[in-house]
Amino acid sequence: MTDYQNEVLEFERIMKEHTNYMRNSINLIASENITSSDVTEAVASDLAHRYAEGQSHERLYEGCQYIDEIEDRVIDLSKKLFNVDYANVQPISGVTANLAAFFGYSDYGDKLMALDVPYGGHISHAKVSAAGIAGLKTISHPFDKDIMNIDIDAMNKKILEEKPKIVLFGGSLFLFPHPVKEAREAADEVGAKIMYDAAHVLGLIAGGQFQQPIAEGADLMMGSTHKSFPGPQGGIILSHKENKEVIDNAVFPGVVSNHHLHHLAGLGIASAEMLEFGQDYAKQIVKNSKALAQSLYERGFDVLCEELGFTESHQLAINVSNIRSASDIAHDLANNDVILNKNLLPGDNVDDSDNPSGLRIGTQEITRRGLKEKEMDEVAEFIKRVAVDKENIKDEVREFMDQYTTVHYSFSQNEGYRFHKL
């Protein structure tokens, strides 16, 4: 065996170890999920090798007839799932979807009104990422940290004063619906587009368990397809058909060349799964988030927004500054196969993001593994035993998660976390 053949075996070994690690872990990362075996097969198909530049039936390459059929089906399923009459399924990520929307409806120097990162905004809403690439000047939504949401009266006043070109809702720490319909009148008065970054809550929207941004008055909804929505990594833009020409051109040739066709097929399969199972899945996610938040609160954790029921999404947030460093807690939990992330909270210094006061938790992946409210109490106890008591619980976590290896809310109902050797 040559050294380079051995490299192939080493990659295989590492991937197998990673797969086993995820199988054995309580994964509470709010931006991840697990796909069904049907979606995984699509992602591993020959489509991974192909190109299809341009819109369906208007390709720059030959040989795309089956790809056109796939894309047409994905678009139709997306429109049905989200009750819209336009969908672009070509963005390769949520950030790419945001960038296309910004390019389509703004000019260099225009203002974008969005949440600051410590208040839940995503980096793509900021100067350092997509907003800055598009040349937008970012201004901040007024925020009420007691309710972890935008201050409606102050927001409308600021829209009228600042006259942004884009009013953007959504974020990466996203506990409660945002005031979309409440902003419509002010946005219309200054000629602003309302956009909604649904990256985190797309699956909850699809399942009818969160706000419906387009119905509430948003002009565009962008999202990623792999968080609460259990598809392959990718992006999507949903809107009204009058925005089709602008957005299609902003996506291609604007920010996407080839749009990762294996993920496109996977998105179609995941969309069919959500049409069949999405309501039950999304409902259980929210139930689990509330149950986990309550269990942590009862163990003395400072879970945000107790008086509001903690959350209406897949996420919950904890201020652990009264315990010890959020970074240390997250690291210790990961060493015990409980995976979550440290997170900035309102009042934290955005320039010191390595030392925030909070932890962000998401329940969408463990929900898909079949855990329900009763199991959330056990998850909370694991977190407490590491964060507060500094115990070593890795073996117990692995034994616990060994009971939950099936991917639920899917047609195949197969065991997840398998290394697929072709």
From Swiss-Prot:
GO cellular component: cytoplasm
Biological process annotations from GO: glycine biosynthetic process from serine; tetrahydrofolate interconversion
InterPro entries: PyrdxlP-dep_Trfase (IPR015424), PyrdxlP-dep_Trfase_major (IPR015421), PyrdxlP-dep_Trfase_small (IPR015422), Ser_HO-MeTrfase (IPR001085), Ser_HO-MeTrfase-like (IPR049943), Ser_HO-MeTrfase_PLP_BS (IPR019798), SHMT-like_dom (IPR039429)
E.C. number: 2.1.2.-
Cell compartment(s), UniProt: Cytoplasm
A GO MF term: pyridoxal phosphate binding
Associated pathway: Amino-acid biosynthesis; glycine biosynthesis; glycine from L-serine: step 1/1
Needed cofactors: pyridoxal 5'-phosphate
Keyword Nucleotide-binding listed: no
Record-listed N6-(pyridoxal phosphate)lysine modification sites: 227
Signal peptide residue numbers: none
UniProt keyword list: Amino-acid biosynthesis, Cytoplasm, One-carbon metabolism, Pyridoxal phosphate, Transferase
Enzyme class: transferase
Reaction(s) catalysed by this chain's protein: 5,10-methylenetetrahydromethanopterin + glycine + H2O = 5,6,7,8-tetrahydromethanopterin + L-serine
Gene3D superfamilies linked to this entry: Aspartate Aminotransferase, domain 1, Type I PLP-dependent aspartate aminotransferase-like (Major domain)
Residues at which (6S)-5,6,7,8-tetrahydrofolate binds: 121-123, 245
Record-marked site positions (Plays an important role in substrate specificity): 226
PANTHER family: SERINE HYDROXYMETHYLTRANSFERASE, SERINE HYDROXYMETHYLTRANSFERASE 1
Family: Belongs to the SHMT family.
Function statement: Catalyzes the reversible interconversion of serine and glycine with tetrahydromethanopterin (H4MPT) serving as the one-carbon carrier. Also exhibits a pteridine-independent aldolase activity toward beta-hydroxyamino acids, producing glycine and aldehydes, via a retro-aldol mechanism.
Assembly and oligomerization: Homodimer.
Descriptive protein name: Serine hydroxymethyltransferase
Native species: Methanobrevibacter smithii (strain ATCC 35061 / DSM 861 / OCM 144 / PS)
Gene: glyA
